[in-house]
Amino acid sequence: MFTPLNQKKLVNVSIVTLKKFGRRYELAVYPNKLYEYRNGMRTPLSEILQTDTIYRSVSKGEIARQGDLDLFCRTHEEIVREILDCGYEQKSEATRVYEQEKTEREIVQILRNKVTRGGRHLSEASLREAIGKVHNIYVGNSKKQSQEILSKLEKMGFDRVGVRVSVEMSDKVAEFVKQNGEIHDGYVMIRSDCFPRFKDMCEKEKVRYLILRREEPEDEEIC
């Protein structure tokens, strides 16, 4: 028996386990690449796997017997993909940290262009601080969490960046904009969360509109 993975390396890998045919099959994988693979990114197996060996137990260094692999009646690569697709991940601390940090980065990136205060975009540090006051980020749907956070930040006095539109003005359009945005000289500003309804109304009423390039607020000054 040999141990191809020492304890130091195991800190940076996750184990994916598939139980089938009354047996156990395991792969040692890099958590960040597994996350990308399972979220639809085209990732080569060589980047996902710490080694392409299929184990009975990664932690003990026990390799799966050839007879156990023959039960699949498939190629080695096909077996590996089945384990990756259908197995469950024994998440390491590194995996949990990576997923949490990735979700946080996605949310910050979404909100950076949607939130202002006093006419200025927030620095990343200020935005993270504001988010921390209203929401505990968890690993999950980044877009959904961003919408929840945005609504909470508005109640704290932050401004939601709107959609700048040139539109053929009518009584119905004017009424909608008054309730869900602002009328300016030559264009209207629609709240971003109300824009889907604005678009539907224009299409239904056959009103032409054009989304204009947004005048970017200045970035927050860092002193």
Curated annotation (Swiss-Prot):
A single Gene Ontology biological process assigned to it is: ribosome biogenesis
Give the record's GO CC terms.
cytoplasm
Q: Name one Pfam family in it.
A: SBDS_N
Annotated compartments: Cytoplasm
Listed A to Z, the keywords are: Cytoplasm, Ribosome biogenesis
User: Which coarse location class applies to the principal site listed for this UniProt protein?
Assistant: cytoplasm
Tagged with keyword Cytoplasm: yes
Q: What is this protein called?
A: Ribosome maturation protein SDO1
Kindly list the organism's lineage.
Eukaryota, Fungi, Fungi incertae sedis, Microsporidia, Unikaryonidae
